[in-house]
Amino acid sequence: MALSRLSSRSNTFLKPAITALPSSIRRHVSTDSSPITIETAVPFTSHLCESPSRSVETSSEEILAFFRDMARMRRMEIAADSLYKAKLIRGFCHLYDGQEALAVGMEAAITKKDAIITSYRDHCTFIGRGGKLVDAFSELMGRKTGCSHGKGGSMHFYKKDASFYGGHGIVGAQIPLGCGLAFAQKYNKDEAVTFALYGDGAANQGQLFEALNISALWDLPAILVCENNHYGMGTATWRSAKSPAYFKRGDYVPGLKVDGMDALAVKQACKFAKEHALKNGPIILEMDTYRYHGHSMSDPGSTYRTRDEISGVRQVRDPIERVRKLLLTHDIATEKELKDMEKEIRKEVDDAVAQAKESPIPDASELFTNMYVKDCGVESFGADRKELKVTLP
């Protein structure tokens, strides 16, 4: 009965994209950097604020970069799937395929001075912030050269030099941390904002409302981004939320609902949100998106939703295919050029995997690095408590 009810709701995922396929484009000149105006077919829905313009200014160069970056992210996640099944990745692993438009669209609207903090589904956000594939794969496999020195794993990617403050494993716990980052930005007069990303499952957490309250009270430059992929683990939004209009959850805080599988719509929304947050304080962005994999690698992803639903979203809403259509329809690239690019990306990912496999395992001393105060004299023993493994200085 639950499945039949869920199946009847599958059209919810398809409606925005069916409307979104036709887009009107005006090309001013034919050079790569020349401006192109694309009008999104899916309108933004706003709460307590004006909606941004649906006319998005871009360029053929940017659209091509969107395709390349999303294709790289997709291939990385596919490779991670294989590595996990080969038992080269241990523990938790949450994949982002299907949601790539969020990572690239957001980056197109902000700078590295702006901070991002997210949940455990963080691989592509790390790459979007300028992270290297080899650093990602090294971290996934627990190697010394990983972005968190092999100690974070899938859920705890990190890149401080690009203002990426992680991957966090506790549902919703990153939201107050993100608002704290926004407080620091305001205190230091940085003229920057923080994007705190969370899923629809975390949208029901009490700490979200507490952080939102203080952010609004102090007019912090915090942008709370709900990545609504419609399932919190295996629980559909209609089962967990009385009001699944997450962009309205702030009540007194403005919000915007966005087609999260359209990279250009995401870019426009994030640009609008940044301008708003710097002047007026927090805003909520609800990104309507979809994940192709299950919640994690232990979840087949097909027990609480139908395979027809998944394939239906792929056919009409896939973020990469939508950009591919733009590139082909408007003669920005040929089919062969795009296939060649995908072939190069596949090799790039394969090379990164091979290089990461050669990276050494962290030293035993890394178990306590960044954990305890230096010179505290903590000792580490083997499982039998007999053999001394490492003594901290």
UniProtKB/Swiss-Prot annotation:
Binding-site list for pyruvate: 94, 120-121, 169, 171, 200-202, 229, 231
Intracellular or extracellular location(s): Mitochondrion matrix
Activity regulation details: E1 activity is regulated by phosphorylation (inactivation) and dephosphorylation (activation) of the alpha subunit.
Keywords noted in UniProt: Magnesium, Metal-binding, Mitochondrion, Oxidoreductase, Pyruvate, Thiamine pyrophosphate, Transit peptide
UniProt: thiamine diphosphate binding residues: 120-121, 169, 171, 200-202, 229, 295
Disruption phenotype: Reduced sensitivity to several IAA-amino acid conjugates.
Transit peptide, residues from-to: 1-28
Classification via Pfam families: E1_dh
Reaction catalysis annotation: N(6)-[(R)-lipoyl]-L-lysyl-[protein] + pyruvate + H(+) = N(6)-[(R)-S(8)-acetyldihydrolipoyl]-L-lysyl-[protein] + CO2
Annotated GO biological process: pyruvate decarboxylation to acetyl-CoA
GO cellular component: cytosol; mitochondrial matrix; mitochondrion; nucleus
Residues bound to Mg(2+): 200, 229, 231
Gene3D superfamilies, alphabetized: 3.40.50.970
InterPro entries membership: DH_E1, PDH_E1_Alpha_Subunit, Pyrv_DH_E1_asu_subgrp-y, THDP-binding
EC class name: oxidoreductase
Names of required cofactors: thiamine diphosphate; Mg(2+)
Membrane-crossing residue ranges in chain numbering: none
Domain of life: Eukaryota
MF annotations from Gene Ontology: cobalt ion binding; pyruvate dehydrogenase (acetyl-transferring) activity; zinc ion binding
EC number of this enzyme: 1.2.4.1
Assembly notes: Tetramer of 2 alpha and 2 beta subunits.
Biological function: The pyruvate dehydrogenase complex catalyzes the overall conversion of pyruvate to acetyl-CoA and CO(2). It contains multiple copies of three enzymatic components: pyruvate dehydrogenase (E1), dihydrolipoamide acetyltransferase (E2) and lipoamide dehydrogenase (E3).
NCBIfam families on file: PDH_E1_alph_y
Name by which UniProt lists this protein: Pyruvate dehydrogenase E1 component subunit alpha-2, mitochondrial
Species assigned in the record: Arabidopsis thaliana
Gene for this chain: IAR4
